[in-house]
């Protein structure tokens, strides 16, 4: 697992880069905090899962528990001091289903109202758990590169039609993905090479 850690780091970098276009969707600093926390928590769950050899079901359960614990602090932190945990949790839970449609019908940037940050939090948390788990445990670790690619596609499709510097956004995502695939393939070749 330790030998695969640099590759997992590159996948996390690629996921972070794929999230850059989400800024133009939400336009709030709260997005940066929410996605950073989702990325780090997802990576921690995947790393502990690889270390302890958790099953897919246990990994998924831990992801759901993390999402439930983080939903209010990440989507509606302003409601915590007022003691509105239960209504905020209900809004965040409803946003699991409703945020996707609302993102398509509200003018950009959408901000943080109605727990709309739940959509990217779910994508980044689940995507990080899947990608880092694949990077650390799978025989076909290259498959982890699909996660940041899909996140970038989602961000571009849901984002504005006139995304600033789209070539830079693509480059930010492609470079770490390419580096990751290269590292994985070189490690595989070294492991198959005859020992002298």
Tell where the protein language model's regions lie, with residue ranges.
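Helix-boundary/low-complexity linker signature
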Residues: 1-196
């Amino acid at each position: 697992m330790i030998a695969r850690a640099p590759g997992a780091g590159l996948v996390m970098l690629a996921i972070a880069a794929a999230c850059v276009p989400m800024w133009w969707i939400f336009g709030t600093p709260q997005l940066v905090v929410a996605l950073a926390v989702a990325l780090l928590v997802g990576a921690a769950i995947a790393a502990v899962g690889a270390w302890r050899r958790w099953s897919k079901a246990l990994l998924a359960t831990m992801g759901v528990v993390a999402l439930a614990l983080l939903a209010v602090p990440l989507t509606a932190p302003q409601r915590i001091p007022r003691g509105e945990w239960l209504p905020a949790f209900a809004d965040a839970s409803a946003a699991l289903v409703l945020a996707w449609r609302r993102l398509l019908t509200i003018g950009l940037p959408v901000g943080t109202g109605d727990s709309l940050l739940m959509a990217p939090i779910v994508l980044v948390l689940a995507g990080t758990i899947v990608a880092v788990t694949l990077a650390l445990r799978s025989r076909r670790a290259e498959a982890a590169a699909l996660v940041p690619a899909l996140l970038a596609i989602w961000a571009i499709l849901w984002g504005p039609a006139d995304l600033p510097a789209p070539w830079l956004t693509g480059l930010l995502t492609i470079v770490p993905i390419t580096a990751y695939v290269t590292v994985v393939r070189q490690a595989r070749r070294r492991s198959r090479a005859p020992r002298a």
